[in-house]
Amino acid sequence: MPLLHPGDTFPQLTLSIPGAQAIQVPGWFDREFGVVLFNRGAWCPYCTAQLRAFQRAGDSLTQAGIRVAALWVDDEKTTAEFTARHGLTFPLGHSADARAVAALTGAFVNEDPLYLQSTGFVLDPRGRVIVSVYSSGAIGRLVPEDVIGLVRYLREHAAASA
C-alpha cells in the first residue's frame, strides 16, 4: 500500500456516478487543478460536513479553476439520496472497492465494516499529486479554503518565476 507523494502521478480511478455516466479521474479534471476526496460514508457526520463545505465553496473553487470529485463505498441509492439531500453539484462516486482503491493510493481501510478512511488529494493540471492527506480515522481532512489558498499561491509563484 504505497502512499502517494508530491509529484507522483495520480492513478486512474473510475467513479460510478448515480444516474450518470461513470467518470475517470484525473482525466475528468480536464487540465484544471483537481481535488479527489475519499469519504467513509453517508453515516459519517465529518464526511457530510466536508462534502457540504466543498459544495458551499463551489463558486470560489470554480473561480480558482479547481474541480472536485469524491467517492465512497456506499451503494448507488444511498449516494443518490445523499447527493440530492445536500445539493451536491460535483460527482460523488458510489460502490467503490475499498481494497482496490487503497492498493492504488495508500488510503487507510476500515475492515469491519469495510470502508475507506478519509483521504484527500490536490492534483495539478497534469494529474500529479501536489498534496496528499491521509487519515486513519474520522478526522483529519482537506478543507476548501486551504485548497483554494494553495492553488492561488502556486499560480502566483508560477507567474512570478515565469
Predicted segments with their positions:
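Chalcogenol-based redox active-site neighborhoods
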Residues: 1-162
